[in-house]
Amino acid sequence: MTGPVNPDDRRSFSSRTPVNENPDGVQYRRGFVTRHQVSGWRFVMRRIASGVALHDTRMLVDPLRTQSRAVLTGALILVTGLVGCFIFSLFRPGGVPGNNAILADRSTSALYVRVGEQLHPVLNLTSARLISGSPDNPTMVKTSEIDKFPRGNLLGIPGAPERMVQNAATDAEWTVCDAVGGANPGVTVIAGPLGADGERAAPLPPDHAVLVHSDAEPNPGDWLLWDGKRSPIDLADRAVTDALGLGGQALAPRPIAAGLFNAVPAAPALTAPVIPDAGAAPQFELSLPVPVGAVVVAYDADNTARYYAVLSDGLQPISPVLAAILRNTDSHGFAQPPRLGPDEVARTPMSRGLDTSAYPDNPVTLVEASAHPVTCAHWTKPSDAAESSLSVLSGAVLPLAEGLHTVDLVGAGAGGAANRVALTPGTGYFVQTVGAEPGSPTAGSMFWVSDTGVRYGIDTAEDDKVVAALGLSTSPLPVPWSVLSQFAAGPALSRGDALVAHDAVSTNPNSARMEASR
């Protein structure tokens, strides 16, 4: 047993923290280690390891450090490789079929579609999407994975489009051109905006027209294309030709293809209108004894002539051309149109019995076929417009936009198809037919127009999910049937047609051999 311990006899411990002799009283961090101390400690550790492993502490060489660096480099390469494999797998998956309905052989790119437990070869991606009911892209898998499934018959729609990428256009623009000469004779259909530089076909100038001849039934004969319409004309009717300013000319109508002829809306014939009660006295008073059917004239303050047709219930303003047609048909004995004062015209009732829009306002100038062999009908309907419009173009060459090229149709002329088409490569058009009238609603059948000039009907009567399965998300563009019929006819796109099984696919009767350079 020990006695009491004197506190002064206890062992004391001195702090390892240096005494702060800084006159400013700066506080030092406890346990602070410098970079040189760490470097020295590492050197001592390497020297101890060298002595244990190599029995040499002189450190003339340091093979252990080289080995550690090699191990670290190898580890970094391994990690980098693993990360690269992971990233590569995101872009090109390993090929597990999973629940995917559309598969593709990685080795041959052959397409397959799953129907139940069987895997069927399929003719094209469009057919596969129609069968699966979704616009999925094929999953690339190994051949060994393909061979694990029981095989079914060949399915699909022969001739269906391989890809369906929708054009981003929201304004509908369709053009049908007919060239009687030049580099591209025949009918050409152009989709999208036109080019307007140089000698490209442009809208007809005011008071210009194109004289054509059509052999198409049921109305063969001569026609005048003007102001976005076509009017039948009898070139032997001097009353009309003289009024139009065509008298005394050697008239030689150019031939017009059925495609362009049908694309231009028809107007009433250019003949003298029938006026009821012609020759009788009108039901209103005039200062001059003028019968019904006669033409009178009044002059403005600037001496501009204003022509009026005398009808039984009033006067109707008419154009100089219609006034000349009426006078050339029956002048009612007047060498010059009787003149009325402006005050008398203002007191006289007005009538609207004649269709004055069926006649040009002024005499026309015919476009020469030798200088301007290309004639076009340009149909357009902007997305924000309530009505469509059509204009007649004329020029020396096709109005193709810069960089746009034509594709010749194999079945040109078969079923009314054009000779060639011009569409932006890589994209097609989801369209819906519309009537020829400017205000017709877009409520017709739906089609897909490919960049190769083929139209495919989309059958929505059987299944309303067909449009979604094809990946067509935006609203269809309107197109008149007179233009759409110029594209080559392709098969209908429906799920029922896509599920048709084949042992073999027959050749297309409208096919043609293409000469390819070796």
Swiss-Prot record:
E.C. number: 3.6.-.-
TM annotation in the entry: 71-91
GO terms for MF: ATP binding; hydrolase activity
Subunit field text: Part of the ESX-3 / type VII secretion system (T7SS), which is composed of cytosolic and membrane components. The ESX-3 membrane complex is composed of EccB3, EccC3, EccD3 and EccE3.
Gene, per the UniProt record: eccB3
GO cellular component: extracellular region; plasma membrane
Topological type in the membrane: Single-pass membrane protein
Protein name, UniProt field: ESX-3 secretion system ATPase EccB3
Function: An ATPase. Part of the ESX-3 specialized secretion system, which is required for siderophore-mediated iron acquisition and for the secretion of EsxH and EsxG.
Compartments it resides in: Cell inner membrane
